[in-house]
Amino acid sequence: MEGEREGVVAKNEDNAGGGGGGLGTGGNGGGGGGGSANGRRRWRGGGSSGYRQHPIIQAYPALLPLPINGATGHAHINGAVSLPLPLPPPVLLYLQPPPPPPLLPLLPKVAAATFYGKPPKAADAAPRGSMWKHRPSKKPPPHAITAALLPLPRDGKALQEKIFFANERKTSEKEVNHVDTHEKFTVAPLDNAIARRPDMGGVEGAEIPLSANHFLVQFDPGQKIFHYNVDISPRPSKETARMIKKKLVEENPSVLSGSQPAFDGRKNLYSPVRFQEDRVEFFVSLPVALARCSVVKEDTGHMLDKQKLKTFKVNVRLVSKLCGEDLNKYLNEDKDGIPLPQDYLHALDVVLREGAMESSILVGRSLYARSMGEARDIGGGAVGLRGFFQRLRPTKQGLALNVDLSLSAFHESTGIISYLQKRCDFLKDLPQKKTRALAEEEHREVEKALKNIRVFVCHRETNQRYHVHSLTKETTENLKFRDRSGKDLMVVDYFKEHYNHDIQFRNLPCLQIGRSKPCYVPMELCVVCEGQKFLGKLSDEQTSKILKMGCERPSERKGIIKGVVKGAFHARSDTYADQFSLQVSKHMTKLSGRVLLPPKLKLGSSGRIKDITPDRFDRQWSFLDSHVAEGSKIKSWALISFGGTPEQHFCITKFVNQLSNRCEQLGILLNKKTIISPIFERIQLLNNVGILEGKLKKIQEAASGNLQLLICVMERRHQGYADLKRIAETSIGVVTQCCLYSNLSKLTSQFLTNLALKINAKLGGCNIALYSSFPCQIPRIFLSEEPVMFMGADVTHPHPLDDSSPSVVAVVASMNWPSANKYISRMRSQTHRKEIIEQLDVMAGELLEEFLKEVGKLPSRIIFFRDGVSETQFYKVLKEEMHAVRTTCSRYPGYKPLITFIVVQKRHHTRLFHRERNGSSSHYSDQNIPPGTVVDTVITHPREFDFYLCSHWGTKGTSRPTHYHVLWDENNFRSDEVQQLIHNLCYTFARCTRPVSLVPPAYYAHLAAYRGRLYLERSDTTMYRVSPLQTVPLPKLRDNVKRLMFYC
């Protein structure tokens, strides 16, 4: 192409000569860059380009595309500066070479230019800077052109190839030259823009030998996998689909070329060899029980007959050929831009669990089987089941299989009457009261409990399964249906006549199991099918019981995991793995971790600063003889009691006195007297939102509108807690602190201390601070005079059975520097189950404004912690949410802070264990790894910047380290620096006297998002449904609350 010249990369930093020109104007190549004897002078264009004087272009002449006369407007570069046009498409981005190494620190990771204005030959001129939104009549859409550069290599070496993108797809240089000038034309970076690991890993801390539940997998890069699509009609259940696949393989060995294909139970079949034909149709017949199921179907008036055999048509079609070479390149080649072959990885995952699927229930990536232990009753019609999780992961050591113990709640397989007796408290006496009917509210609760559950009838043998869609409005006794002759029949009479069965629970409704036509089944004749995951919200008691099932000490968990891999808990066969040339190691991965030292903490003591180092094994510290770092002043507060006995009420005066005394000892000024005498109400008040709000308003009025704190003492946990928090924080404007009477009966020093610390944090105080500020800890990055803001973000979604409620997002940000231990939040509701934060730019803008008011200047750096993102969403989250933060920052002229974007993951299955030395077990083998343990080798990503950090001491079960993945890093952290930063932050969580497992910005965001969820859920008496397309906004916080850590 005319005007194209090669640039030159200087070989020596200290003697950098001038580089070649970029792409010039009007077809002429840009001139060479000016030389520099010492590498300090800026790169300057020496050619005739009209744009050479712009600093961005001086730094990077390759940013300029090839201009063609005809377009007007301006180019907006990096969201900050503009260039005058003509600069029309087609755009060609020249990626080779990057600038000399001395300039690398001066440039952003990605330079981007968006061109605005009037496209060539457009009929009318668009307004200046209008994104080319003008559309000529009956012509293709106008231009919206973006140019972006690849992230610069850290070594400063030139990229090895030119890459051209046109019309949002990779293309050739020749095709670029012939792009229609009215088509959208984009020059974009490669997908792999995730930050690379900056070094070989950290070195700080004492070494500790560990093992991880990752098992190395050897695979043959030359092994092809043939992916077939499977279409079965009529659509079978998952269990039936597996039976069909098994019989299909048994009956057609020659057609399938003798292979034993792996099946995911839905649509995908994977074979190590190609079938005889790429498209083939089979007919598979399965035996079905002769008995007729007892289901009354309206308009037929007879039982649904079942045939001896049911025939399924199976269409198998070749979709693609997958090869292991791409995965081998991804694992072993140190290059950016190599995509992870997800299809091949998924195929291998299916292959490795195929053997276990024959005797297990698959839920997500976990398999549950009786061989892992009997189901345990956890109450409420649910049982807890043990299983195992397995997933292939690309790691530094190669492909590894992550195997872990898994727990989940399932519906108990029992009769519907018995199930409802356990599930619904108001039906506990149902077997003794067979004539009992359901009130309107009870009918809704029972329907909610049974909806979508699979059942089978029990008075006769049948393998037919049904989904419960709803309940009949009429009771069984009054329910009629019309037979084929048009005669109305009573359901009760029908079952007596045809099955000699007297319906016992006549005043209960029938189950409606037909979607299109009404099909009725009496409740007492139905049984809940086994193996159904419990999707409803677990109660606190159920959650506690299922967590206890998973509280194995490290040695026990390690033994279970080893047993799974060796096949002790399922009939695992290596047949499938052998066919696909896979070999899974039976040994856990051995590696070395490092234990980081705890930071020195700052407390108060009689008005002086006191430092302590948490040197206990669990890194806990005490406030004995110490003050909080900064105590709040609470002059106006009140107490209200909900429920409780007269004896418990008598304890309130003692509680108020001891709490105020403990606060005084901690340096917190809590008025020894409440503004009004304690108020005692029945707990039923929490059921009535209107009366509750009126009562709280009266308390606020008694304080002349200046009530700072309301302590709420409850007889027990109550669903009205959500209404209480919502009313207090959004309507009344007061911070609340709830506690239970059961704790007041003891009034231990630990309880009073914890309560005082929470109150202090909520009312603007500061409990703990680092003795050495962040600029002292990481002087290469942080400066005292350049403030830094730590941000955290999380999105919470409604429980799985809720198909309409909005998701809730929370963003928090630190408001002080250099302590960085006070955070405020912003919350929003957004589209149902959407993970990307929709209004991040608005919330970030509000937080920046608050930071500016508190600190006096905008932060020069932003460290953003994003919780709750899966690996498949990394690129989308980085692209959209980083853009939102950048957009917010660009509203301040000339403001461009350096941003580091880190994803925080707790929901993973990597576990770290003490490793026995010389094959002998040590006294550490049954202990959790110590707080501060960090791992950034062997089991981490082959190239990207991630690590595991266990910052807390696990008191129960086996510790789960937190996985931190740096997606974007403009601050150029080294491994040791970012690990030390996060580790030390974990000691500053406001309501704990020990380090927490999650970095506080992410932890606070999680708490704030949960609070927003409470605002929507409310108590059952005030719940409402919305359409999936409607997003109910969260109620607005009162001004005197939203600047506090009320959610803590």
Swiss-Prot record:
GO terms for molecular function: RNA binding; RNA endonuclease activity. It comes from the Eukaryota. Residues 709-1017 form the Piwi domain. The keyword Phosphoprotein does not apply. Expressed in the reproductive shoot apex. Disruption phenotype: Lack of the shoot apical meristem (SAM) in the embryo, but formation of radicle and scutellum. In weak alleles, formation of an incomplete SAM and abnormal leaves production. Residues 16-37 have a biased composition (Gly residues). Residues 422-530 form the PAZ domain. GO terms for biological process: maintenance of shoot apical meristem identity; regulatory ncRNA-mediated gene silencing; regulatory ncRNA-mediated post-transcriptional gene silencing. The keyword Cytoplasm does not apply. One of its GO terms (cellular component) is nucleus. Residues 131-141 have a biased composition (Basic residues). Residues 1-14 have a biased composition (Basic and acidic residues). InterPro entries: ArgoL1 (IPR014811), Argonaute_N (IPR032474), PAZ_dom (IPR003100), PAZ_dom_sf (IPR036085), Piwi (IPR003165), Piwi_ago-like (IPR045246), RNaseH-like_sf (IPR012337), RNaseH_sf (IPR036397). Residues 1-50, 121-141 are annotated as: Disordered. It holds the Pfam family ArgoN. Keywords: RNA-mediated gene silencing. Involved in the RNA silencing pathway. May bind to short RNAs such as microRNAs (miRNAs) or short interfering RNAs (siRNAs), and represses the translation of mRNAs which are complementary to them. Regulates shoot apical meristem (SAM) initiation and maintenance and leaf polarization through the trans-acting siRNAS (ta-siRNAs) pathway which probably modulates the expression of the ARF2, ARF3, ARF4, ARF14 and ARF15 genes. Belongs to the argonaute family. Ago subfamily. This is Protein argonaute 7. The lineage of its organism: Eukaryota, Viridiplantae, Streptophyta, Embryophyta, Tracheophyta.
